[in-house]
């Protein structure tokens, strides 16, 4: 998983259960949910994700970097505040 977090340092140290929650709360399309979970939770390679969703690996990388992660980060303050309050 270290490779994934070098790409997205803001997500470093986020546990899998919280990453799943971020993906769901971001209200992504089904294809984007599959891309996000495959890369950010399961650390799959871009080529494997692309084969699963019918895109090439550079398109998957671009989608993750420009649309999916920014959308997830837009719900981050709400989620992180709720998680802190629950502790």
Protein language model features and the residues they cover:
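Short alpha-helical "recognition helix" segments of helix-turn-helix
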Residues: 48-53, 60
């Amino acid at each position: 998983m270290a490779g994934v977090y070098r790409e997205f340092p803001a997500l470093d140290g986020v546990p899998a259960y919280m990453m799943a929650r971020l993906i769901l709360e971001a209200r992504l399309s089904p294809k984007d949910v599959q891309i996000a979970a495959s890369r950010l939770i399961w650390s799959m390679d871009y080529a494997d994700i692309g084969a699963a969703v019918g895109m090439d690996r550079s398109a998957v990388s671009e989608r993750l970097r420009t649309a999916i992660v920014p959308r997830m980060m837009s719900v981050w303050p709400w989620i992180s505040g709720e998680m802190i309050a629950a502790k």
